[in-house]
Amino acid sequence: MGGLPVSPKYVIKAKMEIKGSVEKHDIIGAIFGQAEGLLGSELDLRELQKTGRVGRIEVNTRSQDGTLVAEIEIPTNLDMAETAIIAATIESIDKVGPYPAKTEVVSIEDVRAEKRQKIIERAVELYKKLLESVPESRELVEEVLRRVRVAEIVEYGEEKLPGGPEVETSDTVILVEGRADVQNLLRHGYKNVIALGGATIPKSIKSLVENKKVILFVDGDRGGELIARNVINALKVDFVARAPPGREVEDLTAKEIARALQNKIPVDEFLQALEREKKQQKEVKAEIVVPPAKLIKSATKKNPEIAQEIVVPAEVYEKLEELKGTLEAVIYDENWQVVEKVPVRDLVNRLKEVERAAHVVLDGIITQRLVDVAYTKGLKSLIGVRIGEIIRKPDNIVLATFSSVKKSEENIQESVSTGESAQTSP
C-alpha cells in the first residue's frame, strides 16, 4: 500500500516470526490493523502513508524450522522521535491472522548518513581534480607573463637592433646573437639583453657598452665559439657565457639560462680554455652520405660567406619585417605567390607534403635538415634570419638571410635572381 517517499530520512528494519503460514499482504494488513488507533490521527500509519510521510512497506518472507520469518522495511520522512515511536509500534504486533507472532526492530537506518558519506566521497574526488587543475592555472599565468615579456622587445639604435627595455638603463648588458635569442631571454625575465644582429659589430653596440659590464652569451657549438672570438676582438667584453654543448641560446629553459650566466667566465679564461681544447681534442670527421649534387662545405654555423644575395619581388621584401618575431614560415611557389603559412617548428614536415613549394622565407634558422628536405623537394631558395651549421649545400639552392635580400623593381618575378658574386663556383 502507498508509495515510497521521494526522499526518506530513515528506514525502520524489523524481523517478525510467525507460527504459521501467511501471505505478505496478511502481514501488511496486521501492521496497519493493529497500529490503527494506538497513536492518534497524527501518527496513524494509513494517514502518514497517504501524505507521503511513510513510504511503501516492503516485506520479504522465508521459512525456517516451521516458522515463517518476515523481514520488514518501512521508510519514513518523520523526525527521529516520531520514527522511533512508529518503530516501537511495529514491535507491539503479536498476531498475524490466527497465528501468534513476535516482532523485533533490528535497526533504524539514517538514510541521510549514507548520503552524507557519498557527498564526502564525491567532495574528495572533486577536490583532487581541483588540485590537479592548479598547475594548469599556474601555466596560464606563466603564459600571460611570457607574452607580456616578449611584447616588451624594443629596437635600439639606428640599426634597430632587437633588445630588452632595460638595455640602456642597466649597468650590465647581455649580448646575444639574434632576435630569437633576445626573445627567449625576455621570456624568462632578462630585460638587459640586446642582439648583435650579424658578424659586423654595430656602432650602436659599441657606444652602448662603453661604460657597462658586458656579458657575451653564445651558443654552445663551433659557431658560438667563432662569434665569441670575433666579438672579443672588436669589442670590450668582460665575461663570456656559453649554452650547454650543442645547444642554442634561443632554445634554453629558464634554469639552463640561469646556470649558463652563473657559470660565466672572464674573457682571458675563456680564450685560454679554447686554446687548451684545441690542443687536447683531435677533430674527427665522420663520413657523410650526401645527395648527388655539387656541394659547398661550411665548417661554421654562422659563416657569413655562405649567405647569398637574392632579389625578390617588392611584395615579398615588404613582408620580411612583418615576419620578424612571429616564428612563422611562408611557403611560395615559383611565381612568389603564397602557398601557405606554417609555424617554423612544423616547416620541415609540412614541406614534405606541399607540392608547389619553390621558395621559403622563415623567421628562424636555416638548418641542415631543412636544406636536405628543400633539396629533395626541388626548392630554389631558403631565406631565414640566419644560417645554421651547413655541412652540405647543393649549388642549385640559394641560402640567404634577411640582410642579404634585395628588392626587385618589379612586383612579380617568376624566377629568382642572385648576385653573380654571391654564387660559389662548382
Curated annotation (Swiss-Prot):
<dbReference type="GO" id="GO:1990077">
    <property type="term" value="C:primosome complex"/>
</dbReference>
<keyword id="KW-0235">DNA replication</keyword>
<keyword id="KW-0548">Nucleotidyltransferase</keyword>
<feature type="binding site">
    <location>
        <position position="221"/>
    </location>
    <ligand>
        <name>Mg(2+) 2</name>
    </ligand>
</feature>
<dbReference type="GO" id="GO:0003899">
    <property type="term" value="F:DNA-directed RNA polymerase activity"/>
</dbReference>
<dbReference type="Pfam" id="PF13662">
    <property type="entry name" value="Toprim_4"/>
</dbReference>
<dbReference type="GO" id="GO:0006269">
    <property type="term" value="P:DNA replication, synthesis of primer"/>
</dbReference>
<feature type="binding site">
    <location>
        <position position="219"/>
    </location>
    <ligand>
        <name>Mg(2+) 2</name>
    </ligand>
</feature>
<keyword id="KW-0240">DNA-directed RNA polymerase</keyword>
<keyword id="KW-0639">Primosome</keyword>
<feature type="region of interest" description="Disordered">
    <location>
        <begin position="407"/>
        <end position="426"/>
    </location>
</feature>
<dbReference type="InterPro" id="IPR034154">
    <property type="entry name" value="TOPRIM_DnaG/twinkle"/>
</dbReference>
<feature type="binding site">
    <location>
        <position position="177"/>
    </location>
    <ligand>
        <name>Mg(2+) 1</name>
    </ligand>
</feature>
<keyword id="KW-0479">Metal-binding</keyword>
<keyword id="KW-0808">Transferase</keyword>
<keyword id="KW-0271">Exosome</keyword>
<keyword id="KW-0460">Magnesium</keyword>
<dbReference type="InterPro" id="IPR050219">
    <property type="entry name" value="DnaG_primase"/>
</dbReference>
<comment type="similarity">
    <text>Belongs to the archaeal DnaG primase family.</text>
</comment>
<feature type="binding site">
    <location>
        <position position="219"/>
    </location>
    <ligand>
        <name>Mg(2+) 1</name>
    </ligand>
</feature>
<dbReference type="GO" id="GO:0005737">
    <property type="term" value="C:cytoplasm"/>
</dbReference>
<comment type="subunit">
    <text>Forms a ternary complex with MCM helicase and DNA. Component of the archaeal exosome complex.</text>
</comment>
<dbReference type="GO" id="GO:0000178">
    <property type="term" value="C:exosome (RNase complex)"/>
</dbReference>
<comment type="function">
    <text>RNA polymerase that catalyzes the synthesis of short RNA molecules used as primers for DNA polymerase during DNA replication. Also part of the exosome, which is a complex involved in RNA degradation. Acts as a poly(A)-binding protein that enhances the interaction between heteromeric, adenine-rich transcripts and the exosome.</text>
</comment>
<feature type="compositionally biased region" description="Polar residues">
    <location>
        <begin position="413"/>
        <end position="426"/>
    </location>
</feature>
<dbReference type="GO" id="GO:0000428">
    <property type="term" value="C:DNA-directed RNA polymerase complex"/>
</dbReference>
<keyword id="KW-0804">Transcription</keyword>
<dbReference type="GO" id="GO:0008143">
    <property type="term" value="F:poly(A) binding"/>
</dbReference>
<dbReference type="GO" id="GO:0046872">
    <property type="term" value="F:metal ion binding"/>
</dbReference>
<dbReference type="InterPro" id="IPR006171">
    <property type="entry name" value="TOPRIM_dom"/>
</dbReference>
<dbReference type="InterPro" id="IPR020607">
    <property type="entry name" value="Primase_DnaG_arc"/>
</dbReference>
<feature type="domain" description="Toprim">
    <location>
        <begin position="171"/>
        <end position="245"/>
    </location>
</feature>
<protein>
    <recommendedName>
        <fullName>DNA primase DnaG</fullName>
        <ecNumber>2.7.7.101</ecNumber>
    </recommendedName>
</protein>
